[in-house]
UniProtKB/Swiss-Prot annotation:
Keywords: Aromatic hydrocarbons catabolism, Lyase, Manganese, Metal-binding
InterPro entries cross-referenced by the UniProt entry: 2-IPM_HCS-like, 4OH_2_O-val_aldolase, Aldolase_TIM, DmpG_comm, DRE_TIM_HOA, PYR_CT
UniProt EC number: 4.1.3.39
The keyword Ligase is annotated on this UniProt entry: no
Residues where Mn(2+) binds: D17, H199, H201
PANTHER family xref list: 2-ISOPROPYLMALATE SYNTHASE 1, CHLOROPLASTIC-RELATED (PTHR10277:SF9), HOMOCITRATE SYNTHASE-RELATED (PTHR10277)
NCBIfam families listed in its UniProt record: 4OH_2_O_val_ald, PRK08195.1
The protein, known as: 4-hydroxy-2-oxovalerate aldolase 4
Annotated catalysed reactions: (S)-4-hydroxy-2-oxopentanoate = acetaldehyde + pyruvate
Organism whose genome encodes this protein: Dechloromonas aromatica (strain RCB)
Top-level class of the enzyme under EC nomenclature: lyase
Gene3D superfamilies: 1.10.8.60, Aldolase class I (3.20.20.70)
Amino acid sequence: MTLKGKKVTVHDMTLRDGMHPKRHLMTLDQMTAIATGLDAAGVPLIEVTHGDGLGGSSVNYGFPAHTDEEYLGAVIPKMKNAKVSALLLPGIGTVDHLKMARDLGVHTIRVATHCTEADVSEQHITMARKLEMDTVGFLMMAHMNSAEGLVKQAKLMESYGANCIYVTDSAGHLLPEGVKERLSAVRAALKPETELGFHGHHNLAMGVANSIAAIEVGANRIDAAAAGLGAGAGNTPMEVLIAVCSLMGIETGVDVAKITDVAEDLVVPMMDFPIRIDRDALTLGYAGVYGSFLLFAKRASAKYGVPARDILVELGRRGMVGGQEDMIEDTAITMARERGLLK
C-alpha cells in the first residue's frame, strides 16, 4: 500500500527514554541543547522527564541530576514550535506531579501502565482531561498481551478520556506482523477521532520496520530518539525513521539533515557507551524483557558474577515487568547461590 501523503506526528524520546542509558544524569545544558536542536529540526513533540516518568527519582529507579521541575522549567521556555510532553506511571507519579507539569507548560501527558493494567490509569487520565491536556494512554510491554486483550485495555483508557492510545513495544520483542496484528485490532476498536501511537525499541533492529508497519495500519503518532538514545539497544533511531519516511512520501515535518546533525553532533558525543545491539540488548528483545532492565542486569552481573544475559533470560522466564527493578538483584543473588558463586 502507498503511504505517500500520510501525515505522522513524530514524538521524541531522547530526553526521557534516553535518560535510562545516561542513568538519569543529563545536565540541564545537555537537555536544553538537544531540545532546541530537535525544535529547530521540526520535531513537534518532545518528552522530558526522569526515564521512569514524573516522580521517578528513587532508590529503585535511580536519582537524576536534576528534578523534573528543573528539567521542564529549563526546556519549555526555549521551545519555539515544539510542544513538550511528560510520562507518568501511576504508582510512581501522582496527580500532584501531573498538576505541576501542567503548571509548567507541559502540553501532553502520557499515562503508562503495563499492558494488562489499564484500570490503574483512570484517576490520572481523568484528571489530565479535566486539565485540558493532550492525554495519551500508554500500554507498555505490548508483546505480553494478545490483540484482543490490548483492545480491551485500550478501550478502558479511551473510556477514561484518553484521546490517543499507544501500543508500546517496551522490550523490542515484536516483529512487524505482531505490530500490525495488535495495532490494526486496536485501531478498529477505537473511536475514529482517537489517535493511535506506536513506541518501538531496536533490540532486534526492528524499530524502523515496526514503526512503518504501525503507520500502515493506522498509527499516526510514532516515537523515536535521536541516535536511538534509549533503553536497551535504544529507541527507533529518529534520523533513520525520518529518512525512510521521506523516501516513502510520509510527511513528518522533520528535516532529514537537521535531525541527523542533532544525532551526530549533540547526542552521540553525550553517550556514556555506544547504543548498539550487544549480546545483552539482543537478549532483551529475544527474551521479551523490559528495556530499562539492561543496566540493572549488567550491574548485578558485575556484583555477583552471573552473566547479564543469563539474568535477563531468567527475568523473561519469570515474566518480570517494568516496576520490578528491585527483583533483578534478588534474581542475580539466587542464581549466584545456585551456581556456587555465593556462600
